[in-house]
Amino acid sequence: MSYYMSPIVQKITGADPGTFVLFYVPECPYCQRALSTLRERNLPFKGYNINNISGNMPRLLQVLTTYSNLTGFNPYHTTKPIIFINGKFIGGMDDLAKYLDVQFTQ
């Protein structure tokens, strides 16, 4: 049986393995830092500007909360950026830095 899945969630769950999915806004310094970090490390990512999502941040948070059982999204995370890898929620910029430290120091 098939069911409807939001295009937002499809971007997360359908990304290639090892590809980060980042929801950001251009004017956010934490978003810019996350994008720069991924670029500097030559890590694959797909970036999606939250301003281009119909309903912007409130809609994004609503969808991510609705489908949190699939992605592990924490509904208490309400800041930008919002980052996933391998279909699972990482967090924001600080969480990305911790994730990369663990991944690259083992």
UniProtKB/Swiss-Prot annotation:
Pfam families: Glutaredoxin. The keyword Transport applies. It comes from Acanthamoeba polyphaga mimivirus. It is found in: Virion. One of its GO terms (cellular component) is virion component. The keyword Heme does not apply. This is Probable glutaredoxin. InterPro entries: GLR_AS, Glutaredoxin, Thioredoxin-like_sf. Residues 8-106 form the Glutaredoxin domain. Belongs to the glutaredoxin family. Keywords: Disulfide bond, Electron transport, Redox-active center, Transport, Virion. Disulfide bonds join 28-31.
